[in-house]
Amino acid sequence: MKPVSLAKYIQKSPFLTKLLLPISNAYVHLSGYRKYGLRYDDLMLEENDDTQKALSRLPKMESYDRVYRIRRAMQLSIENKILPKSEWTKPEEDYHYLRPVLAEVIAERKEREAFDALIVKKPETQAHATSSPAHAH
């Protein structure tokens, strides 16, 4: 069963968006990943095959920056420190750089699976449908 998501419904409604945006911003702030200089997409698990393929499609500089942010965050976590507030990830810097690529990879995989499951049947022709005179006795 596919999980239910209200995100699209909320985004279509200006009232709900305005109502829930402060809650969303508070949640992002409390999650704390920006205090370590991370972006939201940095938190995606790499163990997934689709994510691995999406990561391999990132531009070199974006991939390098991602690894740097993760290593710096791990070092800060080991030292029980956070970045100075001036170095926290700002909301305008926290854009989705991996999610669009991942969506493309997943769509390609689903399309490939659909074609792999496709059964090709040879259509019967009229010549095969009627018995040939050689077999009629």
From Swiss-Prot:
<dbReference type="InterPro" id="IPR036544">
    <property type="entry name" value="QCR7_sf"/>
</dbReference>
<keyword id="KW-0813">Transport</keyword>
<dbReference type="InterPro" id="IPR003197">
    <property type="entry name" value="QCR7"/>
</dbReference>
<dbReference type="GO" id="GO:0005743">
    <property type="term" value="C:mitochondrial inner membrane"/>
</dbReference>
<keyword id="KW-0999">Mitochondrion inner membrane</keyword>
<keyword id="KW-0472">Membrane</keyword>
<dbReference type="GO" id="GO:0006122">
    <property type="term" value="P:mitochondrial electron transport, ubiquinol to cytochrome c"/>
</dbReference>
<dbReference type="Pfam" id="PF02271">
    <property type="entry name" value="UCR_14kD"/>
</dbReference>
<dbReference type="GO" id="GO:1902600">
    <property type="term" value="P:proton transmembrane transport"/>
</dbReference>
<comment type="function">
    <text>Component of the ubiquinol-cytochrome c oxidoreductase, a multisubunit transmembrane complex that is part of the mitochondrial electron transport chain which drives oxidative phosphorylation.</text>
</comment>
<keyword id="KW-0496">Mitochondrion</keyword>
<protein>
    <recommendedName>
        <fullName>Cytochrome b-c1 complex subunit 7</fullName>
    </recommendedName>
</protein>
<keyword id="KW-0249">Electron transport</keyword>
<keyword id="KW-0679">Respiratory chain</keyword>
<comment type="subunit">
    <text>Component of the ubiquinol-cytochrome c oxidoreductase (cytochrome b-c1 complex, complex III, CIII), a multisubunit enzyme composed of 3 respiratory subunits cytochrome b, cytochrome c1 and Rieske protein, 2 core protein subunits, and additional low-molecular weight protein subunits. The complex exists as an obligatory dimer and forms supercomplexes (SCs) in the inner mitochondrial membrane with cytochrome c oxidase (complex IV, CIV).</text>
</comment>
<dbReference type="GO" id="GO:0005739">
    <property type="term" value="C:mitochondrion"/>
</dbReference>
<dbReference type="GO" id="GO:0045275">
    <property type="term" value="C:respiratory chain complex III"/>
</dbReference>
<comment type="similarity">
    <text>Belongs to the UQCRB/QCR7 family.</text>
</comment>
